[in-house]
C-alpha cells in the first residue's frame, strides 16, 4: 500500500447536517482541506481506508469543519469520531528550499552547536509567528525550541539531525 500521511484527527460531529470537527495535523490545512480534494478516513478500529471527497471546509474556533460528498446527516458521520484523515504520498506538493513537511522534522535528533544531544522532536506546535518544536530528551523532559533562524542552524532530514544554537535562557 502507498505510504500515507496524517492530516487530521476527527474529534466530533458538528451540527446535524453531516459536518465533522477536525484537529488539523498538517502543515497546510487550507491546501489539504480544499473543496474537491480527496482524503482517506481510517476509522478507530479499522485498517482499511475509506476514500472521501471534501464537499465543504470552514474554520470554527481552533477546528476545521469538513463535509464530504454523499454524506448529508449526522447519522452518516457519527461513526467517524476518533478517526484519522490521511492523504497519499503522491498528494504531497513540492516545497521551496528550506521548507519541510512536519513528518520530515518529527523524529529528528536535536543537537547543539557544541555537540550536546538534546533529544528527539516529538511534536510541532503552530502558535503563531513561528513553529515551535517539542523536543523530548533522555530524561523524558520536554524542551520547546522555536523554529527561527537565530536558533536553528542546520536541518539534515536525510540524517534526521538538526543543529541548534542555544540562546541564553532557551533551555532554562
From Swiss-Prot:
<comment type="subunit">
    <text>Binds ribosomal protein uS19.</text>
</comment>
<protein>
    <recommendedName>
        <fullName>Ribosome maturation factor RimM</fullName>
    </recommendedName>
</protein>
<feature type="domain" description="PRC barrel">
    <location>
        <begin position="97"/>
        <end position="170"/>
    </location>
</feature>
<keyword id="KW-0690">Ribosome biogenesis</keyword>
<dbReference type="InterPro" id="IPR009000">
    <property type="entry name" value="Transl_B-barrel_sf"/>
</dbReference>
<dbReference type="GO" id="GO:0005840">
    <property type="term" value="C:ribosome"/>
</dbReference>
<dbReference type="GO" id="GO:0043022">
    <property type="term" value="F:ribosome binding"/>
</dbReference>
<dbReference type="Pfam" id="PF01782">
    <property type="entry name" value="RimM"/>
</dbReference>
<keyword id="KW-0698">rRNA processing</keyword>
<dbReference type="GO" id="GO:0005737">
    <property type="term" value="C:cytoplasm"/>
</dbReference>
<comment type="similarity">
    <text>Belongs to the RimM family.</text>
</comment>
<dbReference type="InterPro" id="IPR002676">
    <property type="entry name" value="RimM_N"/>
</dbReference>
<dbReference type="InterPro" id="IPR011033">
    <property type="entry name" value="PRC_barrel-like_sf"/>
</dbReference>
<dbReference type="GO" id="GO:0042274">
    <property type="term" value="P:ribosomal small subunit biogenesis"/>
</dbReference>
<dbReference type="InterPro" id="IPR036976">
    <property type="entry name" value="RimM_N_sf"/>
</dbReference>
<dbReference type="InterPro" id="IPR011961">
    <property type="entry name" value="RimM"/>
</dbReference>
<dbReference type="InterPro" id="IPR027275">
    <property type="entry name" value="PRC-brl_dom"/>
</dbReference>
<dbReference type="GO" id="GO:0006364">
    <property type="term" value="P:rRNA processing"/>
</dbReference>
<keyword id="KW-0963">Cytoplasm</keyword>
<dbReference type="Pfam" id="PF05239">
    <property type="entry name" value="PRC"/>
</dbReference>
<keyword id="KW-0143">Chaperone</keyword>
<comment type="function">
    <text>An accessory protein needed during the final step in the assembly of 30S ribosomal subunit, possibly for assembly of the head region. Essential for efficient processing of 16S rRNA. May be needed both before and after RbfA during the maturation of 16S rRNA. It has affinity for free ribosomal 30S subunits but not for 70S ribosomes.</text>
</comment>
Amino acid at each position: 500500500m502507498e505510504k500515507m500521511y496524517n492530516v487530521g484527527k476527527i474529534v466530533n460531529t458538528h451540527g446535524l447536517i453531516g459536518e465533522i470537527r477536525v484537529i488539523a495535523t498538517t502543515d497546510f490545512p487550507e491546501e489539504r482541506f480544499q473543496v474537491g480534494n480527496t482524503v482517506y478516513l481510517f476509522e478507530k478500529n479499522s485498517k482499511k481506508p475509506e476514500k472521501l471527497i471534501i464537499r465543504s471546509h470552514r474554520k470554527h474556533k481552533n477546528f476545521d469543519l469538513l463535509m464530504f460528498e454523499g454524506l448529508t446527516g449526522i447519522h452518516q458521520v457519527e461513526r467517524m469520531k476518533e478517526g484519522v484523515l490521511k492523504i497519499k504520498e503522491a498528494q504531497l506538493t513540492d516545497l521551496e528550499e528550506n521548507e519541510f513537511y512536519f513528518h520530515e522534522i518529527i523524529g529528528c535528533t536535536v543537537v547543539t552547536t557544541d555537540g550536546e544531544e538534546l533529544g528527539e522532536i516529538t511534536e510541532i506546535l503552530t502558535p503563531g509567528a513561528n513553529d515551535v518544536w517539542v523536543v523530548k530528551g533522555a530524561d523524558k523532559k520536554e524542551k520547546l525550541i522555536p523554529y527561527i533562524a537565530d536558533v536553528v542552524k542546520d536541518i539534515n532530514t536525510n540524517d534526521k539531525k538538526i543543529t541548534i544554537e542555544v540562546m541564553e535562557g532557551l533551555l532554562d
